């Protein structure tokens, strides 16, 4: 069975983005993201793809979901739906969903794992991670709170579905 992991950095109010960008810069979170996703297929929506500074993400199979039938994501595969994107991952051990908000919302009922960077900020934004229903998710691992090189407090948390 395919392990489906959602990976995200979330503010205290579950904000994940503002104006198609992350509202903070935590180099340690980027390093964790890279280390966790290398060698795995990563699935993202079109807006997330377009916001990436480097496309495709190297060392990973990039799959972009777009309802635009003729959408071209150079260096990536495209899929018309989350289900089609997951079907492209047949044979892989794990698929990592990396956003954005709409894709997280669709994927949450299918996810087996959550890899959340809890950012100790409450920010205004226009993209939010879905609420984590504690009746379905248990905390499997949590790092101590750390302070990033940019001065932002954060923790890495791994949730497993009950």
Swiss-Prot record:
Protein name: Dihydrofolate reductase
Disulfide cysteine pairs (residue numbers): none
Enzyme class: oxidoreductase
PANTHER family: DIHYDROFOLATE REDUCTASE
Binding residues for substrate: 7-9, 29, 60, 117
Organism classification: Bacteria, Pseudomonadati, Pseudomonadota, Betaproteobacteria, Neisseriales
Source species of the chain: Neisseria meningitidis serogroup B (strain ATCC BAA-335 / MC58)
Reaction it catalyzes: (6S)-5,6,7,8-tetrahydrofolate + NADP(+) = 7,8-dihydrofolate + NADPH + H(+)
CDD domains named in the record: DHFR
Domain DHFR: 3-161
Ligand binding (NADP(+)): 8-9, 16-21, 45-48, 65-68, 98-103
Keywords: NADP, One-carbon metabolism, Oxidoreductase
An example Gene Ontology molecular-function term: dihydrofolate reductase activity
InterPro entries: DHFR (IPR012259), DHFR-like_dom_sf (IPR024072), DHFR_CS (IPR017925), DHFR_dom (IPR001796)
